[in-house]
């Protein structure tokens, strides 16, 4: 379920708060940040139909992968631009509950046995057409931390082996008291039935589900197949109590919406109960999967409780080992996605991770008629709210152009870059002691007021943010009150849960509390400058800024109305809370929920309501009335409550026609001109143009291997024997496109007599995507030639390639960093469900 990694985590990135109300845009015009005036998103479930529509020009581009067999030759690509990108992958989620009827997957060893029952190579080679790589853990071949955990993942030695899986499962079932009668496993004289929820809207996952069903039936289970899309999965799988056993297995997929060097979320999101993404989702009334080891280790990674990159890597190894051993979520394969764009469209930005659907593409793209028509796989699959909604890839791809985060991950390096905030950081390492200003304040959840911090406080890091405000889509100016409310909300809803606590959400709060625990205080310097003091440190300054980032993508009055609607029990922020309480999952794009927000705003206006988080700073009744009026007017005109600050605004959502229309925001002083992201269009990727190595080398000699490259800063090389063991590896610099690998005679003598392999990667400091060259050579004990043997050479930038070494290179390039999805907030990012 591609949980994109897009739902912005709350790493004290107040940025996560999404706006949902819009007021009628004033008739005056201002600065425009886009080339096109309108974008229409239209649902196309069938990829083949969408492909033909893009080819014919009825669609300008399609925001979902197209099967490789539809783009095999020149004729199939007529009138098309084809872009390849990595970032999506597949997994199996198991239900490990031990409550209710007998559940075989409550037994860890049976879950683990599934790793031998799934044929990862078949998934890659047949279902994905070779465009992918097998996965053992949540770190795929393009994750920078892959190298650091390579010894852990390789130690599992998973190979497709149905006999072994059958034996492992049978042994555990017999221990539990089950018996096999006439080829069917029974428990307490009842056949053991397994329900697999299969995503029927995705051909790959449908095939995975069908194959797995057949294999489990062959072992002796009764298998019930339940088909559906993400909307149904939100209810049956993610929203239900695992103890009800409405499902036992689910075919998931995940996608990225951005790119980041360092990932603090992935392991927690995919393995740890505290993050509210494992069976039970931390819903108090549900059965919940528990694992203190995973919770403790991933919380240390998440909150920066390490001093060095090596220490961080050890934590990642520990969590990975425990996560794979537990096998509640089993990873299968990563995918190389192919996106199609009509040949007449310019300005496409094929970002690493997010691919063509990155937020930069619609903002930067141009067409002949000043509009874009974009096909999407699904137009609506989950609630639109910034707290515990927007967790699917489909909503996030659109939300990304409606909102501007304070900072963002560079689409090709992953480096945190300023967008609407700039910063200055003061810290002296993980044991730093920065004095906290006496005027700094912190929210007191008991007195419901801002209090000055205690005297003589210190913090590990101090970050001063300069905020680049503009207008909300409803015409009102952004201001410091929006920031104040965001900090209040994070603190109030991220406080430890009390009895009958109404400001607690089972999904949002456990994540928020990690940030709140590190927040020491903050100080307003002026109307657009704020100081933040935090007990958080990272060896990368951008990560410190991301953790402490103060920004808002939703007006405070919308946030306040949402908060009241949840406290009053009308709706819920999260899916699981909504299901458990039998209320609606708050979605600002839906007229029904927008009406709830509208009516609360009317009550606020009539009662002259002033939030307790703002009454110490803003006393003008006219200010509050104007804020309420603007958002009320917006909802009345547009029938939704999605209000933000990005270059496009949401004009309408039409569920009947399965369309969403956005228009360029031309009012006010939007800070970025059209073409701001032009530099990302034609990124120069590294390339190897030649490698000179003899087909036969003597093991008694030294060897020089000249290499010619383009757009490269360094060369990484790996030499391995016929058994795949790495004999030598290293890195050499590039000087004027030239580089030489020097191997001394001692190194050469270690080669196997016979076939060996050289893999070379050209890397660039500007793009974290190396170019791969691979060739075989023969090693001889003497200087005499060996019999003729076919020598294979491969040059590859992407596509049907063995990416195992590519991952290693990326990891070396960025050290202990992580390539990960950066949700449209510049903050920590999560995978989003597909």
PLM region spans:
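Ligand-site clamp/hinge motif
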Residues: 31-72, 222, 673-698, 704-706
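Aromatic- and charge-enriched surface segment that lines or borders ligand/interaction sites
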Residues: 50-58, 101-113, 117, 434-499
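Append "and occasionally in soluble cytosolic enzymes with long acidic Gly/Pro-rich linkers
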Residues: 106-218, 318, 360, 364, ...
């Amino acid at each position: 379920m591609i949980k994109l990694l897009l739902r912005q985590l709350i790493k004290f990135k107040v940025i996560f708060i999404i706006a949902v109300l819009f007021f009628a845009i004033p008739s005056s015009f201002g600065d425009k940040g886009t080339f096109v005036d309108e974008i229409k998103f239209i649902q196309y479930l069938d990829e083949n139909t969408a492909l033909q529509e893009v080819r014919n020009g009825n669609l300008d581009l399609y925001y979902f992968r197209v099967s490789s067999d539809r783009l095999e030759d020149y004729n199939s690509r007529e009138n098309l631009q084809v872009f390849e990108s990595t970032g999506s992958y597949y997994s199996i989620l198991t239900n490990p509950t031990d409550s209710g009827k007998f559940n075989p997957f409550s037994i860890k060893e049976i879950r683990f046995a599934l790793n031998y029952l799934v044929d990862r190579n078949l998934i890659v080679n047949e279902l994905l057409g070779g465009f992918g790589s097998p996965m053992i853990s949540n770190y795929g071949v393009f994750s920078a931390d892959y190298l650091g955990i390579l010894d852990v993942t390789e130690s599992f030695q998973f190979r497709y082996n149905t006999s072994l899986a059958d034996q492992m499962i049978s042994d555990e079932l017999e221990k539990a008291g089950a018996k096999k009668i006439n080829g069917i496993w029974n428990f307490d004289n009842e056949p053991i039935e397994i329900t697999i929820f299969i995503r029927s809207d995705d051909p790959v996952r449908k095939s995975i589900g069908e194959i797995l069903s057949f294999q489990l039936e062959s072992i002796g289970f009764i298998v019930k197949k339940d088909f559906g899309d993400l909307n149904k999965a939100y209810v049956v799988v993610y929203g239900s109590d695992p103890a009800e056993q409405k499902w036992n297995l689910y075919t998931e997929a995940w996608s990225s919406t951005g790119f980041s060097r360092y990932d603090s979320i992935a392991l927690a999101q995919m393995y740890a109960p505290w993050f509210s993404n494992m069976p039970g989702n931390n819903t108090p009334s549900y059965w919940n999967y528990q694992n203190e080891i995973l919770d403790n280790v991933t919380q240390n990674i998440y909150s920066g409780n390490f001093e060095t990159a090596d220490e961080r890597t050890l934590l990642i190894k520990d969590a990975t080992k425990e996560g794979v051993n537990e096998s509640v979520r089993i990873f299968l394969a990563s995918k190389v996605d192919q996106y199609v764009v009509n040949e007449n469209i310019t300005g496409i930005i094929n970002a690493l991770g997010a691919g063509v659907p990155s937020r930069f593409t619609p903002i930067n793209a141009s067409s002949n008629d000043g509009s874009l028509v974009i096909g999407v796989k699904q137009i609506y699959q989950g609630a639109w709210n910034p707290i515990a909604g927007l967790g699917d890839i489909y909503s996030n791809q659109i939300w990304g152009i409606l909102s501007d985060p304070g900072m963002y991950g560079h689409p090709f390096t992953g480096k945190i870059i300023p967008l609407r905030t700039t910063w200055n950081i003061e810290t002296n390492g993980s044991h730093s002691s920065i004095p906290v200003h006496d005027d700094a304040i912190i929210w007191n959840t008991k007195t419901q007021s801002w209090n000055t911090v205690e005297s003589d406080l210190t913090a590990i890091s101090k970050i001063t943010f300069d905020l680049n405000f503009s207008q909300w889509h409803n015409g009102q100016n952004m201001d410091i009150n929006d920031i104040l409310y965001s900090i209040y909300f994070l603190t109030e809803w991220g406080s430890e849960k009390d009895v009958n606590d109404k400001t607690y959400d089972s999904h949002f709060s456990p994540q928020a509390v990690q940030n709140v625990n590190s927040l020491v205080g903050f100080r307003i310097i002026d109307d657009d400058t704020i100081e933040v003091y935090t007990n958080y440190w990272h060896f990368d300054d951008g990560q410190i800024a991301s953790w402490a980032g103060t920004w808002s993508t939703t007006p405070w009055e919308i946030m306040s109305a949402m908060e009241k609607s949840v406290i009053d029990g009308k709706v819920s922020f999260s899916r699981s809370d909504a299901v458990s309480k039998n209320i609606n999952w708050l979605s600002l794009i839906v007229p029904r929920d927008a009406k709830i927000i509208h009516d609360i705003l009317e009550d606020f206006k009539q009662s002259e309501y002033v939030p307790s988080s703002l009454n110490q700073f803003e006393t003008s009744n006219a200010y509050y009335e104007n804020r309420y009026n603007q958002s009320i007017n917006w909802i009345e005109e547009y029938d939704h409550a999605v209000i933000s600050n990005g270059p496009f605004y949401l004009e309408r959502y039409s569920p009947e026609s399965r369309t969403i229309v956005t228009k360029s925001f031309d009012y006010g002083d939007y800070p970025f001109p059209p073409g701001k992201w032009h530099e990302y269009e034609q990124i120069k990727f590294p390339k190897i143009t030649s490698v000179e190595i003899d087909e036969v080398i003597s093991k008694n000699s030294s060897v020089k291997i000249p290499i010619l490259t383009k757009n490269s800063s360094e060369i990484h090389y790996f030499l391995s024997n016929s058994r795949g063991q790495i004999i030598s590896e290293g890195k050499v610099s590039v000087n004027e496109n030239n580089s030489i690998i020097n191997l001394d005679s001692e190194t050469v003598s270690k080669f196997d007599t016979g076939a060996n392999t050289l893999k070379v990667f050209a890397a660039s400091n500007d793009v974290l995507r190396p170019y791969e060259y691979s060739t075989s050579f023969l090693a001889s004990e003497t200087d005499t030639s060996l019999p003729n043997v076919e020598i294979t050479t491969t040059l590859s930038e992407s596509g049907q390639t063995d990416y195992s070494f590519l991952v290693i290179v990326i990891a070396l390039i960025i050290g202990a960093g992580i390539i990960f999805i950066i949700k449209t907030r510049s903050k920590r990012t999560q995978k989003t469900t597909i």
